Design a protein with these regions (language model features):
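Pre-recognition alpha-helix immediately N-terminal to the DNA-recognition helix
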Residues: 19, 23, 50-56, 115
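N-terminal leader segment of winged-helix/HTH proteins
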Residues: 1-42, 91
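Charged, amphipathic alpha-helical coiled-coil/dimerization segments
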Residues: 2-7, 86-145
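Short amphipathic alpha-helical elements of helix-turn-helix/winged-helix folds
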Residues: 26, 54-58, 146, 153
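Short, hydrophobic-biased segments on the C-terminal half of alpha helices
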Residues: 67, 85-86
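C-terminal regulatory/oligomerization modules of transcriptional regulators
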Residues: 1-13, 62, 138-157
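N-terminal helix-turn-helix DNA-binding core of bacterial DNA-binding proteins
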Residues: 29, 33-80
Length: 157
């Protein structure tokens, strides 16, 4: 027994397996590992993929999108988002151009970026399908609905 610790007093859970946070930690770590192995073959990190897919989604109808909108949807702080976009730009996958107001920069995919996303998105979705294959369709739908409740408002709109 660890000296000075009494888990019956400091935790509401009898075992770690009853802790949603503990379970989420293990699930997310395992899931990320599976996704990262797929993306590595395409030369992308997981954050780069998230931003690339976000740019692709937000510009799919020809709309202009700035870094603020990308960061909001991707759940990234402005500095991290900017660094990831800079890395995508250096790889030739995205480009930034000044917006009409001059303060923000619009981001779009290059032809190479679109090509990579056309490979990466189906590969990630296949990895997702494989990872979640222990769940039947009803369980997967319920899990997705539950996750949607936990995502901060405005992120996936």
């Amino acid at each position: 027994m660890s000296e000075g610790l009494n888990f019956e007093k400091i935790s509401v859970h009898d075992t770690p397996k009853q802790s949603p946070g503990f379970l989420l930690w293990h699930i997310s770590t395992s899931w990320r590992t599976s996704i990262e192995s797929v993306l590595k073959t395409l030369g992308l990190t997981h954050p780069q993929f998230v931003v690339l897919a976000t740019v692709g989604w937000l510009t799919r109808n020809g709309d202009l999108v700035n870094q603020v909108a990308i960061g909001k949807m991707a759940g990234l702080d402005p500095n991290t988002n900017s660094q990831i976009i800079k890395g995508l730009e250096q790889k030739g996958l995205a480009k930034r151009v000044p917006s009409s107001d001059g303060r923000a920069k619009n981001v779009s995919l290059t032809k190479t970026g679109a090509h990579i996303l056309n490979q990466a998105l189906p590969a990630v979705e296949k990895a997702d399908s494989h990872f979640f294959n222990l769940l039947n369709a009803k369980e997967l739908n319920l899990m997705t609905q539950t996750f949607q409740k936990l995502v901060p408002k405005g992120v996936t709109d």
